[in-house]
Design a protein with these regions (language model features):
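Long, intrinsically disordered, low-complexity segments
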Residues: 22-23, 81, 116-119, 185, ...
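Conserved, well-structured interaction surfaces
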Residues: 44-52, 56-66, 85-163, 179, ...
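An aromatic- and glycine-enriched ligand-binding surface/loop that stacks and positions planar moieties
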Residues: 23-89, 189, 193-205, 209-213, ...
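Flexible, polar/acidic helix-loop-strand segments at domain edges
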Residues: 92, 98, 339-407
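Short coil/turn linking the two alpha-helices of tandem helical-hairpin repeats
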Residues: 158-162, 167, 243-247, 421-424
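Sec-dependent bacterial lipoprotein signal peptides
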Residues: 1-20
């Protein structure tokens, strides 16, 4: 049973905003007692309620607000490792249209936009309430501030990756028409990277929170697992700098990666398979995870934003499955994100990651084959009975699989790439770091490492973790990337007739939803078509 419950609890102390449009309700905030906000948010306890509320939207993307937006699926469907699947081509039509680079204002990631702006709004609320806190120590005040600022960067980072040009504000809107200026992608990056550097330079956040052993059991004594940390900030920084191809900050990002590599707090889990087990959550390889909890859950189809588990395993498993040793007959999957055969075939037989990544179901096992079925599914987040057996809520919606967002393996591969791109030798530290990942996978080390080797290793290591598409896009700016690792040459029509359009630079930023355009006529749609 997992014990890290604090950050799986969603409080409603700070009311959410469910649109970024021009409406007075965007600013309405109520507190649990009905007393004036200035009087309520004065104590440390109440300030912490607002902080936990700022974390709450992290749990919403997989299902809520009318769309499924599991973060790894959103990050994989436009890439080259998976098909979209589902019942038909119109099941989650927005995913299918994004997959084929024909999305529009009515078929995009509309609810993800809302989730992220809800998180931003709650972070801004917390930062405002801190000014009212009279019963908060200065140390706690700084700790809460930096958590909120880093969370806010995280939410904006998702918006920046997908939409690029977005409304940007660091204080909630207080005057009609309650709209914010729309920044270009480069402007958003500049604002976020400066904010991120301020958080990092403050050195307020701990490098890591720890899972400890007590009475023979793993426990989280402080209830802190899931909070943002300095290490998580380093990973966001490297991710943003590399996606922007901001060479002026490569050395700084490399320094942050080296700090994590030199720290005794992080190491690769010796077992790649163990990472994906419940006991592997928050292991030494984990840098940051989003917690999902099967016990004490309140999440249901009528209350999708309540505390609970995740629907991800249901989404990505076969329909009407007859059962196996891990998942009983009668449980139901929905057939999204079947793995491409070519993805399975890219692993060598010696690669220990293959059978942990790929759930291959024998052809004689009968289940309801849905659209684009390949009999190969993502093993990392596949459903198991043990991951919902203590759930009191709707079963399909309450698996307890944490979402592994940043792993130490990514730190090593980030460092290898950044070293090479700042003039490092392919036989030096970059080789050491990349080969550490390969050795864990049971593969021979490389004698000389190139940037393209790192990109290829990233593909093998992170299948199904939502990173491949963004690697392909950013590799457009990497001179040493091969055709198989660049979006313009890898994301092209396939031989099966599923993808009929090619990726172009116009497809980097997806369309803004029509509802957002209607709520603010000043918003300019991305030039996607």
């Amino acid at each position: 049973m997992k014990t890290n419950k604090i950050l799986a609890i969603g409080l409603l102390a700070a009311a959410t905003v469910l649109t970024t449009g021009c409406s007075d309700s965007f600013l309405e905030v109520e507190n649990p007692t009905g007393e004036p906000l200035e009087d309520y948010y004065t104590t440390d306890e109440h300030i912490q309620e607002a902080l936990i509320a700022a974390y709450d939207p992290l749990h919403w993307p997989d299902w809520g607000l009318g769309q499924y937006n599991a973060l790894n699926i959103d990050g994989e469907i436009m890439g080259d490792n998976f098909w979209v699947g589902g019942a038909t081509k119109t099941d989650m039509q927005n995913w299918h249209m994004l997959f084929n680079y024909e999305a529009n204002e009515n078929n995009t990631l509309g609810s993800l936009w809302t989730v992220d702006y809800s998180g931003i709004k709650r972070c801004n609320d917390l930062l405002k309430y801190l000014d009212w806190g009279t019963d908060v120590t200065e140390a706690n005040r700084k700790l809460y501030e930096m958590q909120a600022r880093l969370l806010r960067v995280f939410y904006y980072n998702m918006l920046w990756h997908y939409f690029g040009t977005v409304p940007f504000y660091l204080e909630n809107l207080s005057e009609p028409p309650y709209t914010a200026p729309q920044y270009t992608a480069d402007q958003v990056y500049a604002e976020l990277i400066a904010e991120l550097e301020a958080v990092i330079d403050s050195k307020v956040l701990p490098l890591k929170y720890y899972k400890t052993i007590k009475e023979g059991k793993e426990v989280d004594d402080e209830g802190q697992l899931g909070r943002v940390t300095q290490a998580m900030a380093y990973m966001v920084y490297a991710e943003m700098v590399m996606y922007q191809n901001d060479e002026s900050r490569f050395s700084k990002a490399l320094g942050y990666m080296k700090e994590l590599i030199d720290s005794p707090s992080f190491r690769l889990n010796p077992s790649f398979a163990n990472i994906w087990e419940t006991e592997g959550e928050w292991c030494d390889e984990s840098i940051w995870e989003i917690n999902y909890e099967q016990t004490n859950n309140e999440r249901g189809w009528g209350s999708p934003l309540a505390v609970g588990g995740t629907v991800l395993p249901t989404l990505i498993s076969p329909n009407s499955f007859p059962g196996d040793d891990g998942w009983s007959k009668g449980n139901d999957g929905w057939g999204f994100m079947p793995m491409r055969l070519e993805t399975y075939q890219m692993f060598s037989e010696q690669d220990k990651r293959r059978d942990v990544t790929c759930w291959v179901i024998a052809e004689d096992v009968e289940y309801t084959k849905r659209y684009q079925d390949t009999h190969i599914w993502l093993q990392k987040y596949r459903p198991y009975d043990k991951n919902f057996k203590q759930s009191s809520g709707d079963q399909n919606l309450n698996y307890n699989n944490n979402y592994r967002y940043y792993r130490y393996a990514e730190t090593l591969l980030n460092a290898a790439e950044l070293s090479l791109r700042t003039g490092g030798s392919g036989t030096g530290e970059a080789k050491t770091w990349l080969n550490e990942v390969r050795t864990r996978a049971g593969l021979a080390g490389l004698a000389n490492v190139t940037v393209d080797d790192v990109l290829t290793e990233r593909r093998l290591e992170f299948v199904g973790e939502g990173k491949r598409y963004f690697d392909l896009v950013r590799a457009e700016g990497i001179s040493g990337a091969s055709a198989s690792n660049k979006a313009t040459t890898a994301l092209v029509p396939d031989e099966y007739g599923y993808r009929t359009n090619s990726w172009t630079a116009k497809k980097k930023y997806i369309p803004i939803a029509q509802g957002e355009l209607d709520s603010d006529p000043a918003l300019v749609q991305n030039a996607y078509k």
